[in-house]
Amino acid sequence: MGKEQELVQAVKAEDVGTAQRLLQRPRPGKAKLLGSTKKINVNFQDPDGFSALHHAALNGNTELISLLLEAQAAVDIKDNKGMRPLHYAAWQGRKEPMKLVLKAGSAVNIPSDEGHIPLHLAAQHGHYDVSEMLLQHQSNPCMVDNSGKTPLDLACEFGRVGVVQLLLSSNMCAALLEPRPGDATDPNGTSPLHLAAKNGHIDIIRLLLQAGIDINRQTKSGTALHEAALCGKTEVVRLLLDSGINAHVRNTYSQTALDIVHQFTTSQASREIKQLLREASAALQVRATKDYCNNYDLTSLNVKAGDIITVLEQHPDGRWKGCIHDNRTGNDRVGYFPSSLGEAIVKRAGSRAGTEPSLPQGSSSSGPSAPPEEIWVLRKPFAGGDRSGSISGMAGGRGSGGHALHAGSEGVKLLATVLSQKSVSESGPGDSPAKPPEGSAGVARSQPPVAHAGQVYGEQPPKKLEPASEGKSSEAVSQWLTAFQLQLYAPNFISAGYDLPTISRMTPEDLTAIGVTKPGHRKKIAAEISGLSIPDWLPEHKPANLAVWLSMIGLAQYYKVLVDNGYENIDFITDITWEDLQEIGITKLGHQKKLMLAVRKLAELQKAEYAKYEGGPLRRKAPQSLEVMAIESPPPPEPTPADCQSPKMTTFQDSELSDELQAAMTGPAEVGPTTEKPSSHLPPTPRATTRQDSSLGGRARHMSSSQELLGDGPPGPSSPMSRSQEYLLDEGPAPGTPPREARPGRHGHSIKRASVPPVPGKPRQVLPPGTSHFTPPQTPTKTRPGSPQALGGPHGPAPATAKVKPTPQLLPPTERPMSPRSLPQSPTHRGFAYVLPQPVEGEVGPAAPGPAPPPVPTAVPTLCLPPEADAEPGRPKKRAHSLNRYAASDSEPERDELLVPAAAGPYATVQRRVGRSHSVRAPAGADKNVNRSQSFAVRPRKKGPPPPPPKRSSSALASANLADEPVPDAEPEDGLLGVRAQCRRASDLAGSVDTGSAGSVKSIAAMLELSSIGGGGRAARRPPEGHPTPRPASPEPGRVATVLASVKHKEAIGPGGEVVNRRRTLSGPVTGLLATARRGPGESADPGPFVEDGTGRQRPRGPSKGEAGVEGPPLAKVEASATLKRRIRAKQNQQENVKFILTESDTVKRRPKAKEREAGPEPPPPLSVYHNGTGTVRRRPASEQAGPPELPPPPPPAEPPPTDLAHLPPLPPPEGEARKPAKPPVSPKPVLTQPVPKLQGSPTPTSKKVPLPGPGSPEVKRAHGTPPPVSPKPPPPPTAPKPVKAVAGLPSGSAGPSPAPSPARQPPAALAKPPGTPPSLGASPAKPPSPGAPALHVPAKPPRAAAAAAAAAAAPPAPPEGASPGDSARQKLEETSACLAAALQAVEEKIRQEDAQGPRDSAAEKSTGSILDDIGSMFDDLADQLDAMLE
């Protein structure tokens, strides 16, 4: 180690002495003598780039730092990350090392590779002194690192309060708090407030708000309220709402904070947050007084008496748009309901800051053209600052100053409209536009939400003009509080300026604002307030001047303040707002409240003067606790001249409406009072002109798309339209107009829409059948207001609310999914439904002529009945991401479990699965226009023919029919897959996958992998001879058999649905390949039983290497997936009419037993490829028994070389024999020291035995003529060949000498094909080179053996025949197989005798079957042991 390295090590170890010794200069004389004048390199850097000074700074050792700096160490040397000693000193956070390094001249603003300057590190770690020192050395706190964060951002993110205070007190504070350009679109854009809110640092949020940060500052994810709500920070949400954040702001995904909480959080905290946000954004809550259901209107809200409806906005025709939240399911239903339906029960989120907005109170004079209809009005309280803002910030709806009050909610705009709709006929000649309509500048009363729901606005209690004196009022407050033992709060009330009359209008939030913070106390006081019966104390007449008015309300002390600030005129005072009171110094909450109540009263009096000539009685709201009032219009008087001016209109906060809004609301009146047009939904009434002509009009441009109204009436002539209204206001029927393209809807709340048909009486556009529908690009274009709306209707549900894409394409009427919320949701489905509608491809059938769907706002997803025209019964459209089908895990319910009606169709809205795997159903036929989405489509199971699959050109062909049934070619055009009408359900096939349905390759793969883990299909049982396979008469065949086996569990689902804790593999009846080889090219292949029975998950193999490419009949075309290379080529020349009679057995899947061994050769099923894990093993299904009866028993075992089997003599089938399902008898046991356990008969036609040489392992015993099922090519060392087949589990008697040391070697011996072997190499040496060569078969294994071998596949690489997993494994297996040997020997002997006797009787067959069943059970246990050992 050189001196430099020694120095670095010494400094690292803080060895000052060694460092000094290394750094001291050698004496000149000594240096000359030694010839070493070379000085040590003090800047030497180790492999990480650390110099000695880096280590010293990081350790904070001032002595070493001084020593190194004296030795001329470079002070700004960088390590591999660009960090300098100053960075490490700042990170470490000690003042003295920092001073030394700064004194040495280190630069404070040079960033590291990550963009950090030392101030970033000091701020992030909360080192106050170091941060202060860096600021004093002119460190720039506005520098951002690579992730766009300033030191203030980091301090806020990590909760470093002291550093935040320090940075905010610096002269760069304003620059630090300014929003950076591009924050709203930059995915990394953030702000100190967002970071503090996200991490729940309340103290820092307070500091930031005090420093003047914009509370409504937005990034891509929304405001700080979005961040706090998403992260479940309840206290932060409360603080932000109290501080006046706008709860209606939408992020770039068009979500409010409440939307985010509804979608993404389920914790207890989120419930509180939901309530807080609901209160902050609630427009009005109404309790329904009666049931309401209009099944003919898609947009109506079905209401039951007692439902609490949150009112969102008003439709131009007078109906209210409301939302009912279902606390049980967490869903919202949104729709329209008549305004007369209920009574208002506003649980008002009152002024937490002690202030409330001056919301308009409607008067009785809302216009001659309006019918006497109740309009329930919300008066939204103010909670300080920008507490509740309209979604789009109404122009002119804000007060002055940094804390300008937004229009309270959506209800604000609708009320501003309703209450300000005055036609010219309403206005007298003396009206001045400078005076607001009565009530629009008033103050919302603040009663708590209790009793007196029935009182209406018109009841007038007696009044007392003079308020009590200050002393008396204080005493009265104390006595009142003492009465219910809460006198400790008397100072709070008195210091805030509250007297009893003002207390009678307090809300719980007002109580919080004055310091009543305990919920129990607050509730008690609120209850007592509701019991106060204080007569109305506000002046009944408009006094002559301001002084008189102030003395009448007991606030004469503010006369000078008001006059000094320009409110000397009594008429000016009606324009005052909460912000103005704060600004001019009226800060006592009680006085503010009293003053604003009196201002509202004064505005009402002024409005009453305007309305005198109308003759309508002035109704005034009595002091009750509930916000209940009905705005009733008097009968219309004689129309007044059209040139009368309308009074000036204001919003809820008493600020004037914008010019456009004024114009929009008063403009239609110029047309004259006689232009009346009946409303679409109501009989013609005199109100039509104002209610419709002065429809939302100009205010629409200030409305975001979440508030789209279903405008049915004609818009005002000069009303500028916002996008939302252009789509939502249509001008009556226009039968010839083609439907315009639907624009992408912005999805608002996650809601559940009641499914109701359209309103009959409404003039709707009829879509002619030939109307052009949307075409694939479907570029949403901005449409004109006049064109009819083809958005959703009886033939197409509106799209579900997808929160993922800001502007998903709307589906055409026939293709739109139903709302995800409409499906009963299992626990695995309960996540948010992500639906990403893609552009529709292909043709869309013309909609049935009839009333066009009413315009549906995209914030109101609807469920509609399926179109009858474009979907055949039982062919529900399915969506699939890649047109595959996955195995459903056992936790994912099928359609029956979802209880979705079979007619729920074209398809139910798909949901992003919460379960372990996506269960993707293959799309139904003709799905050129399927909207792909990452989804799982629920499939109705019990109706109609199966869904035709998609056309895929590359699919391998397989037959889905039994040999004795003709191939139905009725649906060739439906895709590659003519699914049979008698396909089984999953419960019938017990977890088998329907190869006759599209995408089954994926399912096969999933199933095969399941078999290696413990899932799997159930065995097949044979019915009595001659009976075709019983199939459940499922009227809905397309719903066949997803794999019910759990991906991770060991249980398989039995036929009855019970969990069978036994492994089952995919073996099933297998047929002889010999017949295949002997068949001529002209004979067509018959489907193997695997296809229909569902137990064989493999695709039939295509033509093998040496075979003629002769195709069979039209086979069920299995849809290939690009993701699976596990395609099985069909054996081309398979025979046709072989009957495979399959049943399901609980223990072993065995080959069909033939009554006569002499039966002709049987056609083999398609070659099976078993995929377990990565190893791919192609297994040839064992022969049913192919071979003439005359064949002698096999000779003693010889050991021929492992050659290709082409040289074996072909055995022609006897021509005259009928082809019956032959039972392959168990072949005679070879002469061996230890017999091989055999399960079922093996092909015995050939006398030649071909041993299978395994690389590095003894040859495995092989059946006579059985081809080596594995390519003899040794597996590549890195890949573990998956042993799929244990010889112990070979269902055929294997004979052949084996050098295996003991039978224990044989059971685990696996005929595994290495993963590297391409599919075409299936069993390459065993493959007959030509159709004439006899193909020999590896018999299928019993399920347990397969499972065991599959489980063994997880073991480390082993030779294909399955090297023993260990001595213990061998020992166990020896014991077990020894036990089985004798039984097997007896069975083989008996079978050999029976074979010689010719046809066996059924009794013999049964006895043999039961014996084999028992042996199968033993093998199950053996497989269990092997499995346990291998795992």
Curated annotation (Swiss-Prot):
- Ranges for domain SAM come to 472-535, 541-605
Q: Where's it found, cell-wise? A: Cytoplasm
Q: Which SMART domains match?
A: ANK (SM00248), SAM (SM00454), SH3 (SM00326)
Record domain SH3: where: 281-347
Question: What residue spans carry the Basic and acidic residues bias annotation?
Answer: 1390-1404
The ANK repeats are at 48-77, 81-110, 114-143, 147-176, 188-217, 220-249
Which residues are reported to carry the modification Omega-N-methylarginine? Answer: 398
> GO BP, one example?
signal transduction
> Which CDD domains does the entry link to?
SAM_caskin1_2_repeat1, SAM_caskin1_2_repeat2, SH3_Caskin1
Region of interest (Disordered), ranges: 348-373, 387-406, 421-447, 630-977, 1014-1039, 1072-1377, 1390-1416
List the SUPFAM superfamilies hit by this protein, alphabetically. Ankyrin repeat (SSF48403), SAM/Pointed domain (SSF47769), SH3-domain (SSF50044)
Phosphothreonine found at: 737, 1065, 1266
According to the record, the residues making up region (CASK-binding) are: 375-469
Q: Keywords for this entry?
A: ANK repeat, Cytoplasm, Methylation, Phosphoprotein, Repeat, SH3 domain
| Compositionally biased tracts (Pro residues) | 848-858, 1026-1035, 1189-1215, 1266-1281
Composition bias of kind Low complexity appears in 357-368, 798-808, 952-963, 1282-1297, 1343-1355
Phosphoserine-modified residues are 358, 423, 432, 633, 646, 719, 724, 787, 889, 891, 987, 1067, 1257, 1364
Any idea which residues bear Phosphotyrosine here?
A: 253
Bias (Polar residues) ranges: 772-786
NADP: present as a keyword of the record?
no
Pfam families assigned to the protein according to its UniProt record, in alphabetical order: Ank_2 (PF12796), Ank_4 (PF13637), Caskin-Pro-rich (PF16907), Caskin-tail (PF16632), Caskin1-CID (PF16600), SAM_1 (PF00536), SH3_2 (PF07653)
Instruction: Name the domain of life this protein comes from.
Output: Eukaryota
Q: How does it assemble?
A: Binds the CaM kinase domain of CASK. Forms a ternary complex with CASK and LIN7A, LIN7B or LIN7C. Competes with APBA1 that forms a similar complex with CASK and LIN7 proteins. The tripartite complex CASKIN1/CASK/LIN7(A/B/C) binds the cytoplasmic tail of NRXN1. Polymerizes, via the tandem SAM domains, to form long, 8 nM wide fibers, upon which other proteins can assemble.
Describe its function: May link the scaffolding protein CASK to downstream intracellular effectors.
Question: Could you tell me what this protein is called?
Answer: Caskin-1
Species in which this protein is naturally found: Homo sapiens (Human)
User: Per UniProt, what is the name of the gene that codes for the protein in this document?
Assistant: CASKIN1
